[in-house]
């Protein structure tokens, strides 16, 4: 039975059993745990500076944050790099701008600490260059991580830009804060100490500012979440609120028909809330520029063509699986990373232009209707 329905039934019983019918009874909102329909909009500031303009479904030019808010998006995910000297984006000043834009449109914010000067993912967990001298000194390195997390959040608090959820690392399948080629197996004495330092920084800011920022740990692909959280739990990493998963079917052992299995297992085993914080699907196999797209025909699922309707159906069906399994959110990764004349580390253009929620004329496509369900 739906847990919100149980709360509602208990609330009704509470009213019925009240000794004094004239005495007001305060009832907890049975929908306090809102299902999150999210969008990672980390690229938007850069895309606009590169000349991108966005249009809603009626061909009206509009702020992309407003387009997503009006569609029904209720959570914006923003990445933060430590000191990315190779770009002017995803640093703290850029993140502040993004958070302000999200909050101005009434959307909540998930702040994603990469703890790196560049992309952190299953293949890369590169330590910030400023911390490299302490890479083999877990205590001092943990202090650097703690102070950076604490000071960043304190700075955001002082400008009324605190996020609602914080990720301690991005796709941290491997041990965090490494140099060069990843080392396996995970040194859990080191890894747990560092992760717990980040967690403590968030909890301490909550105490200082009387806030309730929630903490998420993020792993790429559900099958990796199964072993990772088991090892993390055994190593004493237990004080967090959310399990975050990346889910891209082309790289996962679980298809849409079986994704409910690991979701249920993780929720029931660790008694944590769970969200898919990265996913995506192509609406076309055509490329808008010379940058190779991440998704090609290998990304396609039987029954879900590379079309706007196929993309929308994928999102709706994945959301249903997550919800029915006890999960509480889904975030589309970079739905506004449209093609421009600007360059990435690898090419000119976008590697995601066939998987955005905008067509190649930057008009919002059918897939963005996925967010409409949050209004129901």
PLM feature spans:
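Aromatic-rich peripheral "rim/lid" segments of glycoside hydrolase catalytic domains that contact
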Residues: 52, 286-317, 321, 325, ...
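Active-site cleft segment of glycoside hydrolase catalytic domains centered on the general acid/base Glu
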Residues: 91-94, 121-234, 238-240, 253-261, ...
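Conserved, mostly hydrophobic/aromatic
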Residues: 39, 68, 112, 166, ...
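Sec-dependent N-terminal signal peptides
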Residues: 4-14
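Bacterial Sec-dependent N-terminal signal peptides
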Residues: 14-32
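Active-site beta-loop-alpha junctions enriched in small/polar residues
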Residues: 42-44, 81-83, 114-118, 168-173, ...
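Glycoside hydrolase catalytic-domain groove-lining segments
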Residues: 62-66, 204-214, 223-299, 316-327
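N-terminal substrate-binding region of glycoside hydrolase catalytic domains
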Residues: 29-97, 101-108, 114-145, 244, ...
């Amino acid at each position: 039975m739906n847990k919100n329905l149980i709360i509602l039934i208990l609330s009704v019983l509470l009213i019925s059993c009240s000794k004094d019918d004239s005495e007001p009874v305060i009832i907890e909102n049975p929908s306090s745990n809102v299902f999150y329909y999210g969008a990672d909009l980390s690229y938007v500031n850069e895309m606009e500076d590169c000349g991108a303009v966005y249009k809603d479904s009626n061909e009206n030019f509009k702020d992309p944050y407003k387009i997503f808010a009006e569609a029904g998006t209720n959570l914006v995910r923003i990445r933060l790099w430590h000191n990315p000297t190779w770009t002017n984006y995803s640093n703290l000043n850029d993140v502040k701008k993004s958070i302000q834009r999200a909050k101005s449109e009434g959307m909540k914010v998930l702040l994603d600490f990469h703890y790196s000067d560049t992309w952190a993912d299953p293949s890369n967990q590169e330590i910030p260059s400023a911390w490299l001298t302490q890479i083999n000194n877990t205590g001092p390195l943990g202090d650097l991580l703690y102070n950076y997390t604490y000071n960043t959040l304190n700075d955001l608090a002082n400008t009324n830009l605190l996020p609602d959820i914080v990720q301690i690392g991005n796709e941290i399948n491997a041990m965090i804060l490494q140099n060069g080629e990843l080392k396996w197996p995970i040194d859990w004495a080191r890894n747990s100490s560092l992760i717990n330092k980040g967690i403590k920084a968030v909890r301490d800011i909550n105490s200082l500012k009387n806030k309730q920022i929630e903490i998420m740990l993020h792993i790429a692909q559900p099958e990796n979440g199964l072993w990772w959280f088991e090892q993390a739990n055994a190593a004493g990493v237990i004080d967090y609120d959310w399990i975050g998963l990346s889910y891209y079917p082309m790289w996962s052992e679980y298809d849409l028909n079986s994704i409910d299995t690991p979701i249920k297992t993780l929720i029931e085993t660790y008694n944590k809330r769970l969200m898919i914080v990265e996913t995506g699907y192509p609406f076309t196999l055509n490329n808008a520029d010379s940058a190779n797209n991440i998704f090609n025909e290998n990304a396609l699922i039987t029954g879900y063509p590379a079309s706007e309707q196929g993309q929308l159906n994928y999102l709706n069906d994945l959301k249903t699986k997550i919800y029915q399994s006890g999960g509480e959110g889904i975030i589309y990764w970079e739905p506004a990373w449209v093609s421009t004349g600007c360059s990435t580390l690898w090419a000119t253009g976008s590697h995601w232009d066939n998987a955005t929620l905008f067509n190649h004329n930057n008009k919002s496509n059918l897939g963005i209707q996925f967010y409409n369900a949050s209004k129901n």
